[in-house]
């Protein structure tokens, strides 16, 4: 599975082998990036992740797989999956963020991960502006 997340002025396209690995990774990100937001999730493998990274201009890379947030990267993600949002890029990612948060809350509401649930159960504060 592929994920697209944003944390402050940075974003990342990543891969997890399955939902369990993804949720584990998100718990880790929450420890070190307390304001990250999930922009989108899609089926995909390591090759898909590498292909998307190949389309991202080198000047947008910050460190490792983290990039400086730019709507060009969001458009690369949409183009790769052949997504043409009818209401615009911002509305698409806002709705996908809400859906991802709801899925996480449903999956973890009966577990001891209280802080994890508390974080994703709040109304989205997704900010897609460019600084």
What are these regions (language model features)?
Residues 1-130:
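Non-catalytic accessory segments flanking enzymatic or RNA/DNA-binding domains
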């Amino acid at each position: 599975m592929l994920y697209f997340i944003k944390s402050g002025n940075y974003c990342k396209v990543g891969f997890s082998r399955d939902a369990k690995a993804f949720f584990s990774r998100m718990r880790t990100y929450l420890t070190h990036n307390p304001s990250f937001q999930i922009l989108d999730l899609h089926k995909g493998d390591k090759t898909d992740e590498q292909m998307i990274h190949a389309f991202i201009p080198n000047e947008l890379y910050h460190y490792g797989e983290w990039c400086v947030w730019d709507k060009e990267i969001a458009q690369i993600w949409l183009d790769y999956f052949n997504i043409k949002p009818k209401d615009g890029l911002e509305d698409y990612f806002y709705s996908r963020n809400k859906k991802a948060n709801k899925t996480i809350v449903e999956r973890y509401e009966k577990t001891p991960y209280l802080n994890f649930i508390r974080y994703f159960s709040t109304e989205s504060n997704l900010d897609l502006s460019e600084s």
